Amino acid sequence: MDMEKIRSVVAEKSARSNILVVGDVMLDKYYTGEVTRISPEAPVPITHVTGTRETLGGAANVAHNLALLGTNVSIACYVGRDAHCDSLLDKFKSRGIDYAGLVHTERPTTTKIRIIGGHQQMLRLDFEDVKPIDGANAEQ
């Protein structure tokens, strides 16, 4: 089977599918640049940032990939009430992902920040609360 036939079959089947993605969503943020020198304050590289980007991570990435296939996608997840959530919502809207199943909590929206110098990831910062969901949020 050639690639065009495969694309046609996937597009036809996906367009008729409705899928609910349930899981941990996250915002992946990347800061890229060039290492220019070592800091005089501590033996760590100083990176001159030349670019930034944000992408959907975790279950949000799964929903995005399904939407790219033409599937009608809805997502159910927990997020915080913060700027990172706002970024996720903007990305859901622009990709046609239904986020009516989103539940706001007092936890931060899970965000992973990666610092990349040249072609090497040098650092990852995780903003998340890994404790189990409980109380009223679990009921929702």
Report residues per predicted region.
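Structural beta-strand/beta-sheet cores of well-ordered domains, especially the beta-sheet scaffolds
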Residues: 23, 71, 111, 121-123
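Positively charged, low-complexity intrinsically disordered leader regions
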Residues: 1-36
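Short hydrophobic segments within beta-strands
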Residues: 22, 76-78, 116
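Conserved phosphate-binding/catalytic loop of the ribokinase/pfkB sugar-kinase fold
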Residues: 104-107, 115-140
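Short, glycine/serine-rich, charged loops/turns that create anion-binding
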Residues: 26, 42, 80, 120, ...
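Short glycine/proline- and charge-enriched loop/turn segments
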Residues: 37-47, 123-124, 129
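Short, flexible, mixed-charge acidic loops at enzyme active sites
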Residues: 32-41, 116-119
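Substrate-binding N-lobe of the ribokinase-like
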Residues: 3-9, 40, 44-111
